[in-house]
C-alpha cells in the first residue's frame, strides 16, 4: 500500500533547489497527493529512483523529458481543479487514466 510523504521528506523537499527537475516533480506530486509508488509505476522506474529524483539527484536524459512532461501535466491538472487526489483510489485512477493501463497495488 502506498505511504504518505513523511515530515522529514517534506522538509528536505522544501529546502532543495526547486529548479531541479526532480524537486519540481516532488512539489507537483505532493501538491497533487500522488504517492511515489504510483508515480514510479507511471514513469516506469523504481520507487527508490523517484525518491532519489525528488531529493534533487540527477535524472538520466532518457527520463528527464518524461519527468518534465509529467510535472507539467500534473501542475496543469492542479490548476484545472482535477487534482489534488482526494484519496489513494483517486490518485491511482488519475494515473491509470493518464497512461491508459492499470497500476499495481
Regions found by a protein language model. Give the residues of each.
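Charge-rich, solvent-exposed alpha-helical interaction surfaces
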Residues: 28, 69, 73, 90-98
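Short, charged recognition helix plus adjacent turn
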Residues: 2, 78-105
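A short, Lys/Arg-rich alpha-helix, primarily the initiator
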Residues: 2-32
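Short alpha-helical "recognition helix" segments of helix-turn-helix
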Residues: 38-40
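Recognition helix of helix-turn-helix/homeodomain-like DNA-binding domains
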Residues: 44-60
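DNA major-groove recognition helix of helix-turn-helix/homeodomain DNA-binding modules
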Residues: 62-80
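N-terminal interaction modules that seed assembly of large macromolecular complexes
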Residues: 33-34, 51
Amino acid at each position: 500500500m502506498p505511504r504518505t510523504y513523511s515530515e522529514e521528506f517534506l522538509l528536505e523537499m522544501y529546502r532543495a533547489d526547486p529548479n531541479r527537475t526532480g524537486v519540481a516533480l516532488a512539489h507537483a506530486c505532493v501538491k497533487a497527493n500522488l504517492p511515489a509508488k504510483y508515480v514510479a509505476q507511471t514513469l516506469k522506474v523504481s520507487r527508490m529512483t523517484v525518491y532519489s529524483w525528488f531529493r534533487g539527484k540527477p535524472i538520466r536524459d532518457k527520463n528527464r523529458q518524461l519527468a518534465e512532461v509529467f510535472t507539467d501535466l500534473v501542475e496543469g491538472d492542479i490548476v484545472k481543479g482535477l487534482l489534488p487526489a482526494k484519496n489513494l483510489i483517486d490518485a491511482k485512477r488519475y494515473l491509470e487514466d493518464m497512461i491508459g493501463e492499470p497500476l499495481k497495488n
